C-alpha cells in the first residue's frame, strides 16, 4: 500500500489553534492505526525548529530540507510523487497533488475585510489549490461547507462538515481507509 503523508510543518509552530488540531489528530491517529500495517508519515519543513510531538509508535517523521514557500510548491509535491503517497492536509494546506484530501478550517480571510495584502492573496491561492486538486474537502461546520462551496465554487458533494477529531468508534475512518486500497 502507498504511504499516507500528513503535512506536519505547523507542528513546528506554537501548538494553539490549527496546530493544536493537527497535533491532537496525529496523536490519536498514531494509536488508531496500530496493527493495521498502514504506512503513515509526517513530512515537515526542516528549518531547524523542533517538531512538537510526543514519541510516535506507528507514524514516521520525515524532515524535508527547504526554504519557506518552496516547501509547499516544490519539495513536498516532489516527495509525494517520488513515494506515490496519498496526501492529507490537516491545516488548510496548499496542495499541488490530486491524490489528496484537505481540511479547510474556514475561509474567513476571503469573506471578511479584516485581512489585507499578501496574507489574503496567499490564502486565496491556497483555497484555489484546494479547489483544483483536493478529492475531498473537510471543514468545521455546515455553515463553512456552504460558504466554501459558494465562494470557491467547489461542489458541496465533495465537502464534508466533520467532527474535529477521530475516534475508534468513528466508522468514517474505515470508509476513508477503504478508499486508499
Where are these regions (language model features)?
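Carbohydrate transferase catalytic cores enriched for Leloir-type hexosyltransferases
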Residues: 1-181
Amino acid at each position: 500500500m502507498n504511504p499516507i503523508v500528513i503535512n506536519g510543518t505547523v507542528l513546528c509552530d506554537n501548538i494553539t489553534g490549527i496546530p493544536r488540531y493537527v497535533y491532537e489528530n496525529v496523536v490519536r491517529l498514531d494509536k488508531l492505526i496500530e496493527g493495521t500495517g498502514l504506512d503513515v508519515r509526517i513530512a515537515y519543513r526542516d528549518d531547524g525548529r523542533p517538531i512538537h510531538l510526543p514519541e510516535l509508535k506507528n507514524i514516521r517523521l520525515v524532515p524535508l530540507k527547504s526554504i519557506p514557500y518552496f516547501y509547499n510548491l516544490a519539495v513536498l509535491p516532489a516527495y509525494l510523487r517520488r513515494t506515490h503517497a496519498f496526501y492529507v492536509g490537516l491545516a488548510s494546506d496548499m496542495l499541488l497533488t490530486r491524490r489528496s484530501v484537505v481540511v479547510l478550517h474556514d475561509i474567513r480571510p476571503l469573506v471578511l475585510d479584516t485581512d489585507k495584502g499578501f496574507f489574503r492573496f496567499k490564502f486565496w491561492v491556497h483555497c484555489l489549490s484546494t479547489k483544483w486538486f483536493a478529492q475531498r474537502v473537510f471543514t468545521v461546520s455546515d455553515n463553512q461547507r456552504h460558504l466554501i462551496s459558494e465562494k470557491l465554487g467547489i461542489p458541496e458533494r465533495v465537502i464534508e462538515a466533520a467532527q474535529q477529531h477521530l475516534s475508534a468508534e468513528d466508522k468514517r475512518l474505515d470508509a476513508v481507509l477503504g478508499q486508499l486500497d
